[in-house]
Amino acid sequence: MLEMLMQWYRRRFSDPEAIALLVILVAGFSILFFFSGLLAPLLVAIVLAYLLEWPTARLQAIGCSRRWAASIVLILFVGILLLMAFVVMPIAWQQGIYLIRDMPGMLNKLSDFAATLPRRYPALMDAGIIDAMAENMRTRMLNMGDSVVKYSLASLVGLLTLAVYLVLVPLMVFFLVKDKEQMLNAVRRVLPRNRGLAGQVWNEMNQQITNYIRGKVLEMVVVGVATWLGFLLFGLNYSLLLAVLVGFSVLIPYIGAFVVTIPVVGVALFQFGLGTEFWSCFAVYLIIQALDGNLLVPVLFSEAVNLHPLVIILSVVIIGGLWGFWGVFFAIPLATLIKAVVHAWPDGQVTDTSS
């Protein structure tokens, strides 16, 4: 048994490049695990730098210098963000306030509907249980309102931090894009010399992460806009707010779509009842989700993601549990990284040293 373990160890860890790759991976994961909070602005800047690299490279290809290309792309990107911040988000925020205001009325309708269930299905429903559930929901709604107020007050403390980030992140993005090669060379100088295997994994992952981030942003925009137009077609209340939630839900594969369906169905049900409008609106929503999963995702991520759905779900749950939001966002790239490392890891044959 011991001899088998020794042979396995020599096969897997006798290559210096494999050891160098292992050291790099352990150091990288340790830094992210222990300092993810401090590195949040840098992580945001890296994600945005990946996103802006493609248009920067296109401008550079037609004759712009790297500095001017990075400046133009960053200015356009900040302009789009400001447009979103001053046009889209205030409307979505206002609709969120209206939704919270209307929740007690929705709860009363739900309670009235639930009260009729014992009469309709006496063998399945107990009036006492229904009343207890309704009272519990009312209590939770009141507590939720208090929590929203407390959270709003507590969030004021983070406004200064947010203001600092709004200045730091664009600056970091600019320098990450403008001085990309210099920074990569600086990183290479501190890495182990035997890093051929690590370089192989990096080259594969770099392109996949680029495709993934660019594809995710495009998927969010397409799904969000399509959902908003579909909801507008039926005059659904809080259409922009729900569309924004649906757009962001694509960040969490499978789980996000399931969770965001609950408020969509709830709002449509309370507005339309179980009539034709409800089923038509819900059908349009399901069609958008189906087109996203079966058409848009394969087109955008055919080169970036080649993982089984169960692996994706487990990656979101495990990595998201370790690193929160960033774990959820990077769950698929990290799972792809693990797969690439496993495939690239040397499986050297042990030679007979006795001869």
Predicted segment positions?
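Anchoring transmembrane alpha helix of integral membrane proteins
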Residues: 1-90, 94, 173, 335-355
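Short, amphipathic, aromatic/basic-enriched membrane-interface segments that mark the entry/exit
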Residues: 6-17, 137-140, 210-215, 232-234, ...
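Generic alpha-helical transmembrane segments of integral inner-membrane proteins
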Residues: 22-27, 31, 43, 71-84, ...
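Hydrophobic alpha-helical transmembrane segments of membrane transport and translocation systems
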Residues: 278-355
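Juxtamembrane membrane-interface segments in integral membrane proteins
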Residues: 3-5, 15-19, 55-62, 68, ...
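Transmembrane helix boundary and interhelical junction motifs in multipass membrane proteins
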Residues: 39-43, 225-226, 236-266, 294-296, ...
